[in-house]
Amino acid sequence: MTENTDAPAPERADLRPPGLNADEHTTLLTFLDYLRTCVIAKTDGLSDEDARRPGVASGTSLLWLVRHLTAVELNWFLWAYRGDDVEPWDDDAPSPGDETVAGSVAAYREAIARANEVIVSAAAWPDRPGVRSLRPNAEAPSMRWLLVHMIEETGRHAGHADILRELLDGSVGR
């Protein structure tokens, strides 16, 4: 593949990963919060229509990713770990045509705040299992497992968000 040196390089809008030397719980939560912020940043300046636009053949859009991450925050931390009754979310359901960037991001931020309450309340017991698992026939995971899993889940989808945003308007960066 030949590189076009005449085209200007896209401007990068990077958020830098946190740099701290802290205990395990603080480090894990700080990295999770960093990734959550990266996902939200990918919606900045987009119209609702663009954010709903599928960027790949699977139909995934930036707003779908935000909705999905909202659901997994609530499902893992509140439903599975703490045992709350949260309304299930169907990954296969199409995005409603009237969803907005502002509304979706607000719902995600609210889910993050609720999840963080659970995370902070369990800081002293990282190995204590939660109430149940989202995985059939699996033991309830510990908070340590949940934090690592959510870093992986959110990081994977932050990468998807990077690509979707670049496909929409050429924006690059974390």
Segments predicted by a language model, with ranges:
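Short, contiguous alpha-helical
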Residues: 2-17, 25-44, 48-92, 132-174
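Acidic/histidine-rich alpha-helical segments that form the ligand environment
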Residues: 94-131, 142-151
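Active-site rim elements
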Residues: 22-28, 101-102
